[in-house]
Swiss-Prot record:
Record has Secreted as a keyword: yes
Parts of the chain on the Cytoplasmic side: 238-273
Organism: Rattus norvegicus (Rat)
UniProt cross-references to Gene3D superfamilies, sorted A to Z: 1.20.1250.10
Job of this protein: Ligand for the receptor-type protein-tyrosine kinase KIT. Plays an essential role in the regulation of cell survival and proliferation, hematopoiesis, stem cell maintenance, gametogenesis, mast cell development, migration and function, and in melanogenesis. KITLG/SCF binding can activate several signaling pathways. Promotes phosphorylation of PIK3R1, the regulatory subunit of phosphatidylinositol 3-kinase, and subsequent activation of the kinase AKT1. KITLG/SCF and KIT also transmit signals via GRB2 and activation of RAS, RAF1 and the MAP kinases MAPK1/ERK2 and/or MAPK3/ERK1.
Name the record gives this protein: Kit ligand
Oligomer status and interactors: Homodimer, non-covalently linked. Heterotetramer with KIT, binding two KIT molecules; thereby mediates KIT dimerization and subsequent activation by autophosphorylation.
InterPro entries (UniProt xref): 4_helix_cytokine-like_core (IPR009079), SCF (IPR003452)
Residues the record marks as site: Not glycosylated: 97
């Protein structure tokens, strides 16, 4: 009985061992953007217009492909949001400044984790370092929303294009973020975050986050581990049945031998009489 339990436990752990790493990998890069980004409008309204938020701004954000600056930008956004969070007290519930910033920080942290797992390869990066600047809440969260919007295209972005700023790009063209338009949440804060625009729909077939591909990738190792578990169970059952059959045969042989011995003993006693 103990051996049977041992085999069952072994099969279960084998399935978990094969299945769990893939699930973990899939979870890291699922879309981390939630409806919490809709609260940015309220947060910007709560902060003074002259309140300055420090951010290491990645040069070339306005002229380079998103995969060139997105990884560094979300990392710097995470640092700035953490610093901003420390300036508020967690004393109120609901949509307080603290809770909004905390939720936005968690979104960015998930983006950072995904960037680390899927860093572009063979990319010639610019040697220009990020510049530390101060932004108003309106400017800062415009950059935040733009970074989230760029994340949608990150998985299908080119891994080979260079990320070097052109020599004709002067510091005047990249020294500030354009905020000539009134602050508005881009479509990313609403419908674009979930079931996106036509451009993302065109890329869905190639995207590694296609639901069909995800389920296939998750089901395949689970099926393999299940088959292996049943195979081990079948082998053990066959071995157990063989042992039981031999044991029954041995018992029957012993009983027959005992009966023969008893008959022979009675026959000798009868002859003696």
């Amino acid at each position: 009985m103990k051996k049977t339990q041992t085999w069952i436990i072994t099969c279960i752990y084998l399935q978990l061992l094969l299945f769990n790493p893939l699930v973990k990998t899939q979870e890291i890069c699922r879309n981390p953007v939630t409806d919490n980004v809709k609260d940015i409008t309220k947060l910007v309204a709560n902060l003074p217009n002259d309140y300055m938020i420090t951010l290491n701004y990645v040069a070339g954000m306005d002229v380079l492909p998103s995969h060139c600056w997105l990884r560094d930008m979300v990392t710097h956004l995470s640092v700035s949001l953490t610093t901003l969070l420390d300036k508020f007290s967690n004393i109120s519930e609901g949509l307080s400044n603290y809770s909004i910033i905390d939720k936005l920080g968690k979104i960015v942290d998930d983006l950072v984790a995904c960037m680390e797992e899927n860093a572009p390869k063979n990319v010639k990066e610019s040697l220009k370092k990020p510049e530390t600047r101060n932004f108003t809440p309106e400017e800062f969260f415009s950059i935040f929303n733009r970074s989230i919007d760029a994340f949608k295209d990150f998985m299908v972005a080119s891994d080979t294009s260079d990320c070097v700023l052109s020599s004709t790009l002067g510091p005047e063209k990249d020294s500030r973020v354009s905020v000539t338009k009134p602050f508005m949440l881009p479509p990313v804060a609403a419908s674009s975050l979930r079931n996106d625009s036509s451009s993302s729909n065109r890329k869905a077939a190639k995207s590694p986050e296609d639901p069909g591909l995800q389920w296939t990738a998750m089901a395949l190792p689970a099926l393999i581990s299940l088959v292996i578990g049943f195979a081990f169970g079948a082998l053990y059952w066959k071995k157990k049945q063989s042992s039981l059959t031999r044991a029954v045969e041995n018992i029957q042989i012993n009983e027959e031998d005992n009966e023969i011995s008893m008959l022979q003993q009675k026959e000798r006693e009868f002859q003696e009489v």
